[in-house]
Each structure stands twice: as C-alpha cells, then as structure tokens.
Swiss-Prot record:
This is Collagen alpha-1(I) chain. Prolines at the third position of the tripeptide repeating unit (G-X-Y) are hydroxylated in some or all of the chains. Residues 1-847 are annotated as: Disordered. Residues 20-39, 93-109, 127-145, 193-208, 219-228, 298-314, 334-343, 500-543, 551-599, 628-638, 697-712, 763-777, 793-838 have a biased composition (Low complexity). Residues 51-65, 778-789 have a biased composition (Basic and acidic residues). PANTHER family: COLLAGEN ALPHA (PTHR24023), COLLAGEN TRIPLE HELIX REPEAT (PTHR24023:SF1082). Trimers of one alpha 2(I) and two alpha 1(I) chains. One of its GO terms (cellular component) is extracellular matrix. Belongs to the fibrillar collagen family. Type I collagen is a member of group I collagen (fibrillar forming collagen). It comes from Cyclopes didactylus.
Length: 847
C-alpha cells in the first residue's frame, strides 16, 4: 500500500556534544599554584590589606603554547552533533579554596603567559584524543569529581511524531477475488431413487385368448412389472441441486464474516518497516540529552575570603576559589539515552512491504449451493480501517556519544567562549562579603557549557564576594537543543485525483461476488474522474465468463508507519549545564529511512461496490470519434424512388404528377443513424481492479512541522563581574576560617588579564541538583532537518474493482447525416392522383 507517512523524523539526537575541544594542548605548566589548601570557609575578609606584593606566584610558565589541539577528532561523517565538548571536567569543586590565607603577596602579576593561541578547537568531532593535558600546577586539590549529576530525568516523551499524514489510502485494492465461486453444490445426492414406480399393474392378463381352439393363451405375462418406474431415474441429481441461487451469494457470506478480517489482522502492520534502520544512529548517537548537566554544583561556596593574612595584607585571595563555580556538575555524563541518533534517515520508505498477505480469505461463507449467480450482493462494507499498526519501534537510541575523553582538570578559563545559550540565570545569592580583592586566581575553565535543556535552576550558590571579574571563559556554545518534536503533521497531501476509469471491460457476467475482501481502508475516494465521454457503445461484449474478480483487498491499511514511538521522554531539563560550545548543530540527519512501510495490511474487505457513483455528468455525448458516419446504411435500397412524384397528376400545385417528392431519394438510408451513441455499453463490471495504481507518492508527508522552536536556553546567569585576574599567588596555607566578616563592599570589578588556561582539572563532584530553574526561553529553532527522501511510491495497487456500469449515457448527438444516398430508383409511377388544382407549374421533373 502506499507508504504510510514517513515516521516522524527521529528526533535528531541532540547534537553530539561538541567533541572535546581538542584539548588545548597542555598549557605550559603554569607555575604550580601552590595547591590551594582546602578552601576554608572564607574568612571574613581581612581588612583588605594592601595587596601584598604579590608573592611571586611562580610566574605561570608561559602557558606552553597551547599544545596543538588534540588531533581533531576525526570528523565524524556527519558532523556528529558536536561531540560533547569534552565535558570540560566539571570544574572540580574548586577545592575549597583554602581560606584565603594571607595571600602570599601576590607575585607581581607575572605576565600572564600569553595564552598559547587557542588551539584550533579540534573540530569538535568525536573528541579528539585529548592532547595530554599539560600537567596543571597542582591545583588545590580538585574536589573529587562529583558523581555525574543525576541524569536529568528523561524529559517527557516527546510528542509522538505527528502521525504521518495519513498516507493516501492506497487505491482500493482490487476487488477481492470473487470468493471462490460457491462450490458448485455437489450434485445433490441423486434424488432419492424415484420411488419405484408402482409395479406396473401386472399387464392385464392377456385375455385369455378366446378360447381358440388353442388353450387359452398363456396368461399374459404378468405384465412384467411395469418398468420399474425407471427407478424413478435417480432424481436428476437433484438438478444438481441447481446450485441454489448463489445463495444469493449467500449474501456475500457475511462478508465471509468479513473473512473475520481474515484475521489477516491487518498485515502485521508490516512491521513498520523497521523504522528505517533508524538511520545510523545519528552520528555519535549524540550523547543523549546530555544528562541534564548535573546540576551545576552549587556554586562552590566561594571560598570565604582567606583570613586576612597575618600581615593584614590581604593574602592573595586564595585562589579565588575558582569562584567556587560549583563545578558544573559533572555534566552528568550524558545520561544514557543517547539522543536519538540523528534520526536515521527516515528509513527510506521501505519498500512497501509486500502487501500483507491478504488475510486468509474469510472463510468462504459456505458456498450456498451455487445458484445462478444471484445478484451480486452489495459489496461488503468497507471494513474498518484496520487498526493502525503498532507504531514502528523507535529505533534504539543511538549510543550515547562518547563523553569527551578524559576530563581534563579544569584549566583556568580559557578565553570566554562564545556565549552559550544563556543558562537560566541562577538566582543571585546575596552577595557575599566582598573579599579583599585578591588577585584573581586563574579562572578555571568554564566547564563545557553544554546546553542542556535548560536545566533546573541550580541553587544559586552563594555568590562569594564578587571577585574581580575574571575574564570570561570561553563562551560555550550551546548545543543546539534537540530539535523540537516534529510539528504536527503537515496537512495530508492533496488527494491525487482518481485517474479516469479504465475502459470498461466487456461486461463480464458478474461473477458471484466473492466474499468481500477485507475492506481496505477506504481509499480516499478519488474524485470521480470525469466521466469519460461515453464511447460509442461498443457492441456489448458477450458477457465474458465472470472473471474472478481480482482479489479485492484494497491494499490493507498501510501499516501505519508506526506512529513514531513516543519520543523518549524529554529529560527534564537539567540545570542549565554550562553552556558548552555549541555543538555544531548536527545536521539533522537525513531523515532516517522511512520505516519500511509496513506490509500493507491485509486487504480490507472489499469496499462495497460503492453504489453507483452519481451518474457522472453525462459525458458529452460520447463523441466517440464521430462514428465514422455510420457506414451509410446500406444505401437504403434505393428507396424505390419515392414514387417519383407521381408525375401523374401534377400533384397539387401541379406537383407535376405529383412529383413524388423528388423521389425522396431513397431515403438515403437514413444516415446510418449514428447509432445512438451506443448506449454506453453497460459499463462492464468494472474490470478487475488493476493493481492498485502505484500509489502516488504519498502526498509528501506533510512537511515535517518545523521542529517547534526549542525553548531558548535559559539565560545564562549573568556572569558575576569578573575579578581582575591576578596571577595566582601561591596559595597560602589555609588560614583558619575566620568568622565570616560582614560583607565588605563589593570591590570594583577589575579586569584581570586572562591567565593562561590551565589544563582542565578533574571533574568535581556534581553539585546537588538545584531546583529546577524556570524554563529558559525557547532555544533557537533547531535546524530543520533535511527533507527526507521522498518515499517510494507505493506499489501500484491492484486494479480497483470495476465500477458498476455507468448509466447509459444519453445517446450521442446524431451523427451527421450520412451522405445523401444515391437517388433511389425511380419509383413506380404513382397512380395518377386526382388532378389537383393545377398549381403553378412546377419545374419539369427530371426526365
């Protein structure tokens, strides 16, 4: 049957996470920042000592020029949705920054090593093997990587893809084969032997011959018992039980019990062709919606400002507890659920499965004894459309893309990447006391901000004192969110017009209607084709023996292409992960091959032969080609020339003897009347339905609704002002946590120079999941997937059952008069008419 609409495009797997940016080659080892002591609670900010001379932090070695970006991961064939940016290891919780000990005097800001040129981010292919992360100076102990944030719960199932537009019902399958002709009633059992005729009366005893001289004739043979009533000739075999009238086609056995729908249960909705092999799981089965990025760990409590260093010099701020930036919870490793891979190409419309085997024809109603074919029972009602096949199975989600390879320890933030879609703005915590303006520690890398679905709003960390604003980390590009669920199915394509009916076959005698095949889904009624002009009536063909009607089954319902399984639940939005680099939106994979259209379900019972369609408008008088002027009817035998005007008495008006009307030239044989346009032969019972026309290509599946726009990713919390990035002085020993001081005034945001990016630290433990943030604004609309290939046209269905003969069209206009026949031979002279009043002398008649 024509293919059901293509299954909705698999939801394009979320774009693969950007491959880890080729890890930046290890930045040269920054001089090791002393390991940060565990960040004690931020002591109350000591009085901001003057910035002690920055102890010389070992000048961060110039970050080695960024090592070559790790080899660009091989570019996945399809641009995998960007592989996860290697999840920048979630910033390990910044080890609690040791209380800002007395900041060692920050060394003078060593010139920040120039940041090695940012390695060209490896093409975020699959994560290139990360270049080895340069050893990072020992960071304060990176908090252990939190367990991956809980994978965001899978979002609610995406809407089931819109059910593809209803494929046009395949053409009505050919009329089911007429049920087997009722079995010809077995010849009735031989009628009971006629009762033996009464034994013939014994022949009359021969009269005893007159007693001739002979002895009386022998007694006439006891009339041999009359022939044994011919043994009642075995009743003619019950006249062969004249096949009972085809049990008036036992009304088509109740449509063969509708063949019980032949249990051909709608052919298993041809298993919706395996959802076209769900195209390859989109490359990199993009990691499922990245498990919602574990909620961003609570913003590590910004280490309390170190206790004032002893010498009141504000100790270098303990490494600005890396702004505690709760490690972006380790982006929970992408929860399983590899996103549905790029929707596989909609499987190419699988070749429509072979028409589901017609379910076994319903049991033939017991064939009534075959009578003369009863009038065809009305065609069984079109069976209901079989239930839609079960939705095609949603192909297994592609495997989650690989998580970026080793999560490097967060390095200092690199240059701020492009701004990912803003995550939901975290609630701004109350400003912590402003710590002394320490030199900024090297900013950690922003974790890869993978745009999750806007995650739940993490609990706002308590913002530490606003440190000087560090340079922005690289803006993570958000991954293009998964394409929204397919919009509602486009409107069903226009119904193709029903083609003109084929020429009527010779009117076969209508075979007894077979049991109605299962009705196919009612084919969309084609528009009745314009009634062709009735052709000249063909001679009524002899009724052919009723051909068996072609099998009716309208093509069973096209197995619905499984309604797209419900999309996997869309994980609830995780907290906005840090916006990762926008994965390149993976190309929407080519639509997965449409699942093969399920095998057409068994033909539905043949629709009842629709009543005669309304009489098509009378076609223009079937001008068959003008019948060639009917062959001149044989020239009428030349009419005897009408009586040539009886030239006898000039007819009145001296029709010279009345000139027979000038012999009406033998009537020219009437121009062979253009036979009335032959009545249209009764439309033979429609010839067996040709194989269903190849279903026009299914109206293109309504355009895939453009994926609803994705909510824009929640706004990124506004980055707190960046503190100036001082060079990280060596961390002093963790001071004892002082009592939290009153929040100092927020220092002006200084802009520090961007420190070199350190290698990514190990991922910190995932912070607890913050409460869900408000849903972020919808993300940008995902790219519309490429239009899937047009499905194959369904196989041409068997010819529809012949339509009932159209009513006889009106006779065509008479053909033009045939040429005037030759003048008939002169008629015999008419009798002289009575002399009319001599009229004016007419023209002399022909000699």
């Amino acid at each position: 049957g024509p293919m059901g609409p293509s299954g909705p495009r698999g939801i394009p797997g979320p774009p693969g996470s950007p491959g880890p940016q080729g890890f930046q080659g290890p930045p040269g080892e920054p001089g090791e920042p002393g390991s940060s002591g565990p960040m004690g609670p931020r002591g109350p900010p000591g009085p901001p000592g003057k910035n002690g001379d920055d102890g010389e932090a070992g000048k961060p070695g110039r970050p080695g020029e960024r090592g070559p970006s790790g080899p660009q991961g091989p570019r996945p064939g399809m641009k995998g949705h960007r592989g996860f940016s290697g999840i920048d290891g979630a910033k390990g919780d910044a080890g609690p920054a040791g209380p800002k000990g007395e900041p060692g005097s920050p060394g003078e800001n060593g010139a920040p090593g120039q940041m090695g040129p940012r390695g060209i981010p490896g093409e975020r292919g699959r994560p290139g093997a990360s270049g080895p992360a340069g050893a990072r100076g020992n960071d304060g102990a990176t908090g252990a990587a939190g367990p991956p944030g809980p994978t965001g719960p899978a979002g609610p199932p995406g809407f089931p893809g819109a059910v593809g537009a209803k494929g046009e019902a395949g053409p009505q399958g050919a009329r089911g084969s007429e049920g087997p002709q009722g079995v010809r009633g077995e010849p009735g059992p031989p009628g009971p032997a006629g009762a033996a005729g009464p034994a013939g009366n014994p022949g009359a005893d021969g009269q005893p011959g007159a007693k001739g001289a002979g002895p009386s004739g022998p007694q006439g043979p006891s009339g041999a018992p009359g022939p044994k009533g011919n043994s009642g000739e075995p009743g003619a075999p019950g006249n062969k039980g004249e096949p009972g009238p085809t049990g008036i086609q036992g009304p088509p056995g109740p449509a063969g019990e509708e063949g019980k729908r032949g249990a051909g249960e709608p052919g298993p909705t041809g298993i919706p062709g395996p959802p076209g092999e769900r195209g390859f799981p989109g490359a990199d089965g993009v990691a499922g919606p990245k498990g919602s990025p574990g909620p961003a760990g609570p913003k590590g409590i910004t280490g309390s400002p170190g206790s004032p260093g002893p010498d009141g010099k504000t100790g270098p701020p303990g490494p600005a507890g890396q702004d505690g930036r709760g490690q972006a919870g380790v982006m929970g490793f992408p929860g399983p659920k590899g996103a549905a891979g790029e929707p596989g190409k909609a499987g190419e419309r699988g070749v429509p499965g072979p028409p589901g085997a017609a379910g076994p024809a319903g049991k033939d109603g017991e064939a009534g004894a075959q009578g003369p074919p009863g009038p065809a029972g009305p065609a069984g009602e079109r069976g209901e459309q079989g239930p839609a096949g079960s939705p095609g199975f949603q192909g297994p989600a592609g495997p989650p893309g690989e998580a970026g390879k080793d999560i490097g320890a967060p390095g200092p933030s690199g240059a701020r990447g492009e701004r990912g879609f803003p995550g939901e703005r975290g609630v701004q915590g109350p400003p912590g006391p402003a710590g002394p303006r320490g030199s900024n520690g090297a900013p950690g890398n922003d974790g890869a901000k993978i745009q999750g679905m806007p995650g739940e709003r993490g609990a706002a960390g308590i913002p530490g004192p606003k440190g000087d604003r560090g340079d922005s980390g690289p803006k993570g590009a958000g991954i293009t969110g998964p394409i929204g669920p397919p919009g509602p199915a486009g409107a069903t394509g226009d119904k193709g017009e029903t083609g003109p009916s084929g020429p009527a076959g010779p009117t076969g005698a209508r075979g007894p209607p077979g049991p109605a095949g299962f009705a196919g889904p009612p084919g969309a009624d084609g528009q009745p084709g314009a009634k062709g002009e009735p052709g000249d009536a063909g001679a009524k063909g002899d009724a052919g023996p009723p051909g068996p009607a072609g099998p009716t089954g309208a093509p069973g319902p096209i197995g619905n292409i499984g309604a797209p399984g419900p999309k996997g639940a869309r994980g609830s939005a995780g907290p906005p992960g840090a916006t990762g680099f926008p994965g390149a939106a993976g190309r929407v994979g080519p639509p997965g091959p449409s699942g093969n259209a399920g095998a057409p379900g068994p033909p539905g019972p043949a629709g009842k032969e629709g009543g005669k369609g309304p009489r098509g408008e009378t076609g223009p008088a079937g001008r068959g080609e003008k019948g060639s002027p009917g062959a001149d009817g044989p020239a009428g035998a030349p009419g005897t020339p009408g009586p040539q005007g009886i030239s006898g008495q000039r007819g009145v008006v001296g029709i010279p003897g009345q000139r027979g009307f000038p012999g009406i030239p033998g009537p020219s044989g009437e121009p062979g009347k253009q036979g009335p346009s032959g009545s249209s032969g009764e439309r033979g019972p429609p010839g067996p339905m040709g194989p269903p026309g190849i279903a026009g290509p299914p109206g293109e599946s309504g355009r895939e609704g453009s994926p609803g726009a994705e909510g824009s990713p929640g706004r990124d919390g506004s980055p707190g002002p960046k503190g100036d990035r001082g060079e990280t002085g060596p961390s002093g020993p963790p001071g004892a946590p002082g009592a939290p001081g009153a929040p100092g005034p927020v220092g002006p945001a200084g802009k520090g120079e961007t420190g070199p990016a350190g290698p990514a630290g190990p991922a910190g433990p995932a912070g607890a999941r913050g409460p869900s943030g408000p849903q972020g604004p919808r993300g940008d609309k995902g790219e519309t997937g490429e239009q899937g290939d047009r499905g194959f046209s369904g196989i041409q269905g068997p010819p529809g059952a012949p339509g009932s003969p159209g009513e006889q069209g009106p006779s065509g206009a008479s053909g033009p008069a045939g040429p005037r026949g030759p003048p008939g031979s002169a008629g015999s002279p008419g009798k002289d008419g009575i002399n009319g009043i001599p009229g004016p002398i007419g023209p002399p008649g022909p000699r």
